[in-house]
């Protein structure tokens, strides 16, 4: 079978450190060809094109789509830079891998989802956590238990390192930009989310890193369609706390408390599954699954196709909308339909449209 011809739009941090290395073993095996890279930075194109052996490079995605024959394209852009990349790919029958968050505009994401569905192409949103072996273990355990409650804890340490991921109007805040990974993972465990209520806390001016313009603490409550209730807590105030951080999911079932982390699963305090830290192995597993689905022309092979993943997007954009409505309980159906919207251009919780 010929190599799958893949293009990349966006050569930022996640492409360079996760997706390109994740695909590299498939390139070396002859299963994948890096046909074309596209980025506005000619320096990035020259450096990464040489490092990963791209056959062609472009600064204009229109030209790339016009000149190259692609089987699939990775779209790894900040959410506010999504324009017509998915539309063009769908029109041409090209499979799409879209890094999260796929948009800050729910209406836009719904439109893209409809285009993908009409075209019948393979799609995947970059939720690699579903590909951890520990996630597989939890899914199996839950098939034999009755879950009642789930808790997500995401406590970040250190300073923000990228401009757009530190601006509320550019990334939607840490809950949208990063905690969405864990929100999607618990959806993998428990199914879709039905309702959301949230409260956020902002540091005052001068209390944190100057470049960070977004809420610093997020406290979100969910009700799942299956009846399970949950909470998700995210904190960005451990700026100078060394390595102090936490990233975990706790699922409380009848007579069973399951604790998930990247490399370990515990049940009632006992380790029941553990593996060595795999680094970015989940990205490689996700890449293998995506390429296999593209080769087979089978969208159902993916764990996070674009359409179903909109529930994860609605869950985090809905949290923002609830927080800016004093914690009002909102229906995710209303978020996805556009009846209730969050406007990323305004930071109502802080009283100003944007902070310079």
Predicted segment positions?
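Contiguous beta-strand/loop segments that form the cofactor/metal-binding neighborhood of enzyme cores
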Residues: 177, 183-264, 284-299, 317-320, ...
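Beta-loop-alpha module in the N-terminal Rossmann-like domain of NAD(P)-dependent dehydrogenases
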Residues: 51-115
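Glycine- and charged-residue-rich phosphate/anionic-cofactor binding loop of Rossmann-like
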Residues: 32-35, 272-275, 293-312
């Amino acid at each position: 079978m010929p190599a799958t011809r893949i293009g990349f739009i966006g050569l930022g941090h996640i492409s360079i450190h996760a997706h390109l290395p994740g695909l590299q073993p498939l390139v070396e095996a002859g299963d994948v060809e890096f046909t074309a890279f596209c980025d506005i930075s000619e320096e990035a194109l020259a450096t990464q094109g040489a490092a990963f052996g791209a056959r062609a490079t472009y600064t204009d995605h229109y030209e790339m789509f016009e000149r190259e024959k692609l089987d699939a394209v990775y779209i790894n852009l900040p959410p506010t830079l999504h324009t017509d990349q998915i539309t063009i790919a769908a029109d041409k029958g090209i499979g799409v891998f879209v890094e999260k968050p796929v948009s800050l505009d729910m209406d836009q994401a719904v439109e893209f989802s409809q285009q993908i569905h009409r075209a019948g192409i393979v799609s995947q949103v970059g939720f690699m956590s579903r590909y951890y072996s520990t996630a597989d273990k939890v899914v199996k355990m839950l098939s034999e238990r009755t879950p009642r409650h789930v808790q997500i804890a995401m406590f970040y340490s250190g300073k923000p390192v990228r401009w757009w991921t530190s601006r509320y109007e550019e990334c939607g805040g840490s809950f949208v930009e990063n905690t969405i990974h864990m929100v999607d993972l618990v959806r993998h465990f428990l199914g879709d989310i039905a309702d959301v209520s949230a409260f956020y806390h902002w540091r005052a001016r001068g209390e944190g890193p100057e470049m960070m313009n977004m809420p610093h603490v997020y406290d979100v409550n969910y009700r799942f369609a299956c009846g399970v209730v949950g909470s998700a807590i995210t904190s960005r105030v451990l700026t100078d706390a060394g390595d102090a951080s936490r990233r975990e999911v706790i699922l409380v079932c009848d007579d069973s408390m399951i604790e998930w982390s990247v490399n370990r699963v515990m049940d009632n305090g006992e380790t029941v599954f553990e593996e060595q830290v795999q680094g970015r192995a989940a990205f490689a597993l996700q890449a293998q699954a995506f390429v296999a689905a593209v080769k087979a022309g089978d969208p159902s092979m993916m764990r996070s196709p674009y359409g179903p993943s909109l529930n994860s997007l609605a869950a985090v954009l809905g949290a923002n909308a609830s927080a800016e409505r004093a914690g009002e309980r909102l229906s995710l159906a209303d978020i996805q339909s556009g009846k209730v919207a969050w406007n990323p251009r305004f930071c109502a919780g802080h009283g100003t449209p944007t902070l310079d």
